[in-house]
């Protein structure tokens, strides 16, 4: 079990926080933060954010929990999230932690040849590629390098970043692009610790879409089989592993680490 406050005094920005892996991360992250730390929750869904923030504030009164309802699929949403973070005081924080968890699977009912509408592809890439790049870049400028502040960036990745899957053209390309973006960040900014973490197959809303709507019948059967045979990864176990990796701080910056590694 992780020691209380093991991650130190942290200013954390967590996207995609209102459900699934992000919500689980928020609950498991708070006890690892020292009192006085700040957690900014970002998601599209205002009511879910309010509820989560209330739960965390009640359970972990030492952590300042803030939230911002923002659609990261738009430039305005990215700007709103950056403004909300900029209003926070880094103060005595020892660490800036940016967790890029927000993402979508796209229309997996289509095969490659069905993507003939550039706007559909552009909108997908805006939310899944452009927004984490621009959000992270803006936050790193908002909280620049200083001797007493460690800056850490996490990209929630996937096996799909490394391996092609039929009918997942958008998802695979988006995840691959995100991995490379953050690998470049690791090369350019040597003081920033960067982790691409693939949490494994989780029983979330996204996986429901994948196993029911994927166009390729073989892949759809494979995903359904994993669910029926209980081969999904426990979401809390995966979130804990990610936080353990951050706590140990022994990974090579920019590396892609899978839950099964």
Swiss-Prot record:
Entry keyword annotation includes NADP: yes
A Pfam cross-reference name: adh_short
Keyword Membrane in annotation: no
Main localization category: cytoplasm
Subcellular location as annotated: Cytoplasm
SUPFAM superfamilies in the cross-refs: NAD(P)-binding Rossmann-fold domains
Entry keyword set: Cytoplasm, NADP, Oxidoreductase
Disulfide bonds: none
UniProt record, GO biological process: tetrahydrobiopterin biosynthetic process
Protein residues bound to substrate: 158-159, 171, 200, 258
Residues annotated for NADP(+) binding in this entry: 16-22, 44-45, 71-72, 175, 202-207
An MF annotation (GO) of this entry: sepiapterin reductase (NADP+) activity
Subunit structure: Homodimer.
Function according to Swiss-Prot or TrEMBL: Catalyzes the final one or two reductions in tetra-hydrobiopterin biosynthesis to form 5,6,7,8-tetrahydrobiopterin.
Family membership: Belongs to the sepiapterin reductase family.
Protein name: Sepiapterin reductase
UniProt source species: Xenopus tropicalis (Western clawed frog)
